[in-house]
């Protein structure tokens, strides 16, 4: 079996793999408008509203990617009793994703990231501003306790656990311990993508930070210095006690670190002239986790995540990748 055949067989094994996703669930809102003129009130554009689109964002985007890749995601999280919370539930339902692990809470506002995109008629719209609306979940949140109870009582077979932390307050230390203990009891991989608190997540199978998150966590600057990158990778392995660290590096590709192995540097798949990076990290961890759940080694999972990341950044807005697209990318890669 060639390397390509092996990777394709892993993609084929995605189907039906059940991945529990413990996540901050975010509504990604895209507001599109046509430029009409400059305002007389301030030096800003006046837009005529064309459309508003709401998509599954944050950890919900990882859930969506697992679904489109052929897996069976089990989302666990909290939304508000508000319009965006209802919209997220509806979007999950429309995609055939059960939301029995998603709880709502009065007084909590569903996190929303609103992006305003502007352009002339019949032209590609460009993002001009983003407005984030969220307040962290309360420390004694009843909905968080409900998530923990549901997690402890879950009896379904699960092949992997994905933790997505966007800093919205769901993932306190107790809930993280519950997730790690759940994965260990089931003897399945558990991965994490944390925007602001990477060093808080010890005992995971793997972490998938981007390079700026590594720099922020360790208080260093990597730039294009491979030696600094490799030193950072080794430091994270030691401090987090994990089996793999996958660092995403934008146009420089990815780097995988495992204890006792030489670093694996993976060049970017496709072009470095991207259309939109929104949610690319969600696609990467979804693919990486699903591959581990399907029996891939960390190196194989990283290769597949690199393909998926290269595909999704060529799409506009928060997007997903399918198993067919992933298999086609493997077959079409002339570098291998």
Task: Set out the residue ranges of the language-model regions.
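Conserved N-terminal subdomain of the carbohydrate kinase-like
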Residues: 4, 10, 16-19, 27-162, ...
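Structural motif
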Residues: 20-22, 130, 159-162, 191, ...
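Active-site metal-binding loops of divalent metal-dependent hydrolases
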Residues: 25, 166, 283
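Flexible glycine/proline-rich, aromatic-decorated loop/lid segments
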Residues: 37-42, 204-213, 253-281, 327-335
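Extended, hydrophobic alpha-helical segments in both membrane/secreted and soluble proteins
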Residues: 162, 179, 190-200, 214, ...
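Conserved phosphate/ATP/ADP-binding segment of small-molecule kinases
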Residues: 168-263
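Conserved post-catalytic alpha-helical subdomain immediately downstream of the catalytic base
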Residues: 239-243, 269-333
């Amino acid at each position: 079996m060639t390397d390509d055949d092996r990777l394709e067989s892993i993609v084929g094994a995605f189907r039906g793999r059940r991945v529990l996703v413990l996540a901050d669930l975010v509504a990604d809102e895209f507001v599109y408008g046509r430029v009409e003129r400059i305002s007389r009130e301030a030096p800003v554009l006046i837009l005529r509203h064309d459309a508003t689109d709401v998509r599954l964002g944050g950890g919900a985007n990882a859930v969506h990617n697992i679904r489109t890749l052929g897996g069976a995601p089990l989302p666990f999280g909290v939304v508000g009793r508000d319009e965006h919370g209802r919209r997220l539930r509806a979007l999950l339902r429309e995609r055939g994703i059960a939301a029995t692990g998603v709880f709502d809470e009065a007084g909590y506002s569903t996190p929303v990231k609103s992006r305003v995109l502007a352009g002339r008629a019949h032209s590609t719209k460009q993002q001009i501003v983003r407005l984030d609306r969220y307040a962290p979940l309360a420390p004694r949140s009843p909905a968080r306790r409900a998530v923990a109870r549901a997690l402890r009582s879950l009896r379904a077979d699960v092949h992997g656990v994905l933790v997505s932390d966007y800093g919205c307050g769901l993932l306190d230390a107790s809930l993280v311990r519950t997730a790690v203990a759940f994965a260990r009891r089931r003897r399945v991989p558990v991965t994490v993508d944390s925007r602001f608190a990477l060093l808080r997540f010890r005992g995971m199978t793997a972490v998938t930070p981007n390079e700026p998150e590594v720099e922020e966590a360790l208080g260093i600057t990597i730039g294009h210095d491979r030696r600094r990158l490799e030193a950072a990778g080794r430091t994270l392995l030691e401090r987090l006690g994990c089996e793999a660290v996958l660092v995403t590096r934008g146009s420089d590709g990815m780097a995988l670190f495992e204890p006792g192995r030489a670093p694996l540097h993976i060049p970017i798949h496709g072009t470095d002239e991207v259309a939109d990076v929104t949610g690319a990290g969600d696609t990467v961890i979804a693919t990486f986790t699903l591959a581990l759940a399907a029996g891939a080694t960390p190196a194989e999972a990283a290769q597949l995540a690199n393909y998926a990341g290269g595909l999704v950044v060529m799409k506009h807005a928060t997007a997903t990748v399918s198993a067919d697209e992933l298999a086609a990318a493997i077959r079409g890669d002339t570098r291998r």
